Amino acid sequence: MNLIIIYIWAQNIYMNNIAENLEPLKNKLRNHSLYHSIKSVDDLKIFTNAHVYAVWDFMSLLKFLQINLTTISVPWYPSKNTSTAKLINEIVAGEETDENEDGRPMSHFEMYLDSIESFGVKTDLILDNINSLNSLDTIHNDIEKLEIKDYIKDFLKFTFS
């Protein structure tokens, strides 16, 4: 019983330390200059047309972590690090199968697309671009062919390096 109490105490100290270390970063994010540069709906459209690729990219990174740090094989076997697997699988579940404001299950990426469509962003090209990125073997060449800004291409190529 004492071991459990010590473990819980150590976990609380560890989590509190993480929270304290994150606070300055959260403040920096809250005060980011980007918030001051978006002054109109057109500015927001420009931003979201680029940012949508980061939303999709995050899910790709998350799936990479899930593949490499959890068990997704058949036959199934226990994960070597169940705490990490639990965290990753919880994030995946939230990102892939959250509920929108109407209670409809959908991914955060799909919610983002719905959101930007609501203020006039056309998402057809975005979806065509993302759907064309379907092979890791050719992804760098496929990214290069996309009709998007070079900085977005660089961002995506960095992820898939």
What are these regions (language model features)?
Residues Y14-L29, L113-I116, G120-L127:
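Non-cleavable N-terminal signal-anchor transmembrane helices
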Residues K86, E90-S161:
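Active-site-proximal alpha-helical scaffolds that flank and shape metal-associated catalytic sites
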